[in-house]
Amino acid sequence: MKKKFLIIQTASIGDVILATAIVEKLHSYHPDSQIDMMIKKGYEGLFDCHPYLNKVIAWDKKNNKYKHLFEIWRSVRSEHYDLIVNVQRYAATGFVTAFGNAKETAGFDKNPFSIFFTRKIRHQIGVPGLHEVNRNNKLIEHITDEVPMRPGLYPSEQIFEDVKCYKSEEYICVAPCSLWFTKQFPEARWIEFLNLVQDNLKVYLLGGKDDVDVCERIKNQAFGKNIVSLAGKLSLLESAALMRDARMNYVNDSSPMHLASSQNAKTTAVFCSTVNDFGFGPLSEDSVVVETRGKLDCRPCGLHGYKKCPKGHFKCAYDIDINELVNRL
């Protein structure tokens, strides 16, 4: 009888993408299994035509949040999963996991409901060399092995055809924005970098609808005439499909970095206030983290970043050598 698995990750886009490494691993060991995933409503498009997922459960956190969660919980109970894997540390999804009527449940010890999980793993952040995919993989080691796989998203053939028009000449992608100020390389510094990019390279600025203004300012203030802003114009999977074949992708410590990892696309990730040891860095074979070489007592200042630099100087961004970005071209 085929196994039934549910993976729960209802946090940000980047976290959801990283959780797909579990999908990859479970499928590699249990290719005939049913794998479902519970995510935040609005991110379903990431999994259009996904070859390994049976069903995506989308939790609406904005409208009747807990009423909808209760409905999801009842649905989950009716599935009789063999294993529910919860990679989050929050009570709401911990409840669904603990009382989801599964034969086995796995999650981290920091989840308030972990006392009811059948498999509880210590959650560690800041351990050198321990990536989020390694942390998450520990939840399924007992039915797979200790080696995590890279996250994977699967743009359809039609999506690749739709973005083909942007690939007629050699190009790079730049995703200049982040939800957090201290995780975002400043606009002036992106402009400084783009002014050093050779004119024969097409530059595509990527981002969501909220990033349109920033991308337009960067495009208009940079010297290059070969810069095109696609902010707000591409879906997440279309962006991933474009990033896959780029000469290089320049990103912050944010979701576009994880999109690039999902395609094993060449990546240069600029880390400002955060550090790679948190375990959320790029995973592509050709990927590097660019950061300040100076010693700053205030860095890292937090796991997720802040709306402004707590010290007021933002040296972790302004002290980065722009040539390290240029040298990756």
Describe each region flagged by the PLM.
Residues 1-329:
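Catalytic machinery of carbohydrate-active enzymes
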